[in-house]
Design a protein with these regions (language model features):
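Arginine residue identity/basic-tract feature
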Residues: 4, 24, 53, 58, ...
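Conserved catalytic-core segment of NTP-binding enzymes
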Residues: 68, 72-75, 81, 85-174
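P-loop/Walker-type NTP enzyme "switch/lid" segment
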Residues: 11-82, 89-90, 98, 155, ...
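Glycine-rich P-loop/Walker A and Walker A-like loops and their local beta1-loop-alpha1 context
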Residues: 1-11
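C-terminal lobe/tail of nucleotide-utilizing enzymes
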Residues: 135-222
């Protein structure tokens, strides 16, 4: 699903850096002790990748925040229009709660259409809302194209966000995990990505430090 998400940003003309800091991400390159720029791998003209498991904790400050890691990322990738940070909600809350890089972080929840995953998605949304004061969320839902549960799940999360957290689920998109990378991007995914880009000042891709925390809420990864 992350591949399709990155493709959608590329289609909007944005150069994306995917920072993979989840528990199952590859270990960071040994050169990371010298600086992050040397560890960023260019996958295509529109997409770069940083294996970042355990890297945020190397940048923890005296208050327990890993916000300095975001600053290091921005300095290491000055040409990136979008930074996608793929990590657990607990890690993202430490990273974004006290950061000053952007006033427009946009958390995107990634879930599938099973009850345990939906419960986990709500728990992550609650954690980010309370600890990092994030209030506008997006949802990327992995499910078959005609899943009878997909729309109901989005409605349920939207209702819970509004009624219990004072937050908003501003958009959602369904991605078929079995689809081929060459298949056309779903229109809903295009709309979701355009909404993320609109949260930053100015029009169109620009060097405005759009950092989108991506909380991977699939149970196997948490």
């Amino acid at each position: 699903m992350l591949e399709r998400l990155c493709s959608a940003f590329a289609d909007e003309g944005a150069k994306t850096l995917l920072v993979d800091a989840c528990e199952r991400a590859p270990a960071p390159d040994e050169l990371s002790v010298m600086g992050l720029a040397e560890c960023i791998e260019t996958l295509s003209p529109e997409l770069s990748y940083l294996a970042a498991r355990t890297l945020p904790l190397r940048h923890v400050d005296a208050q327990g925040s890993t916000a300095p890691f975001l600053q290091a990322i921005v300095e290491a990738a000055p040409r990136a229009d979008v930074v996608l940070v793929h990590a657990a909600a607990s890690e993202l809350s430490r990273m974004f709660a006290r950061q000053t890089i952007t006033s427009y972080p946009r958390p995107l929840l990634i879930a599938d259409d099973h009850p345990a995953s939906v419960t986990h998605a709500y728990a992550a949304m609650k954690l980010l809302a309370l600890r990092a004061r994030m209030s506008v969320f997006g949802l990327v839902l992995g499910a078959a194209p005609h899943s009878p549960r997909a729309e109901r799940i989005a409605e349920q999360l939207s209702s819970c966000a509004d009624n219990f957290l004072g937050a908003v689920l501003d958009g959602w998109a369904l991605i078929d995990p079995a689809c081929r990378p060459t298949e056309p991007l779903p229109p809903a995914l295009r709309r979701l990505v355009r909404g993320v880009l609109r949260t930053a000042p100015g029009a169109g891709p620009s060097r405005s430090a759009r950092a989108a925390p991506i909380g991977d809420l699939l149970p196997a990864l948490n």
